[in-house]
Amino acid sequence: VIYIKHNLLGVLGLSLYMVGFHYGYFFLEAGIGSIILFGGVQVVMFTSSILSKKQPTLFNWIGMIAAMIGIILLFFPFDLNSSQPINGLILMLIAALGWGIYSINGTKSKNPLTSTMSNFIFTIPIVITSFIIFPDNISLTYFGIFLAICSGAIMSALGYSLWYTILPYLEKTIAALVQLLVPVIALALSMLFL
């Protein structure tokens, strides 16, 4: 029998991330969504670092300010008459809050594989409930379900386990800055494949 000790913050963070991420991309393109997501994650992790009395370095602040200016410029001027980008922005900020919480929680993980597995197991009912409450009118095929399981449940879980393995060795501000590579990768891959 495998004993699974779940962590409430890990489950909460992963649930917010998955639900916000899923619904946010109905309104946003991949590159813009990832910029909002990881810019927001940076704010959450910087705030956590400051609140825990670990002051960011000058280099950290420069990176943070540059990222925030980039996000503001990306969305300026913002069309307040269109609800679609605002919905996407709000949902992606919810995902950012969730991933920030999940990442901060990972800095304390003693067993990354077990932590990730228990977080996924306890997140599944929350995510399924959100799909029932907010159906998104998609058609499911067996092949599509298979691909979702392979990419989402298996590959993401392995990636999240790796992230939880690395996190204890990084300062929160460095972990936040490292994640700013994701939007660049997402933009490049979306230009190639989408």
Question: Where are the model-predicted features located?
Answer:
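Specific transmembrane alpha-helical segments of multi-pass solute transporters/efflux pumps
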Residues: 2-33, 37, 73, 152-170
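Cytoplasmic-side transmembrane-helix entry/capping segments in multi-pass membrane proteins
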Residues: 3-12, 55-68, 88-89, 110-121
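Juxtamembrane helix-entry segments on the extracytoplasmic side of multipass membrane proteins
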Residues: 2-4, 61, 76-98, 132-150
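Helix-helix packing/entry segments at the starts of transmembrane helices
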Residues: 33-40, 106-123, 156-192
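C-terminal transmembrane-helix exit sites in multi-pass transporters
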Residues: 40-65, 184-194
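Transmembrane alpha-helical segments that form core, pore/gating elements
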Residues: 44-46, 50, 81-134
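Hydrophobic transmembrane alpha-helices of multi-pass small-molecule transport proteins
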Residues: 56-77, 125-128, 180, 189
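Hydrophobic/small/kink-forming positions within alpha-helical transmembrane segments
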Residues: 11, 15, 19, 39-46, ...
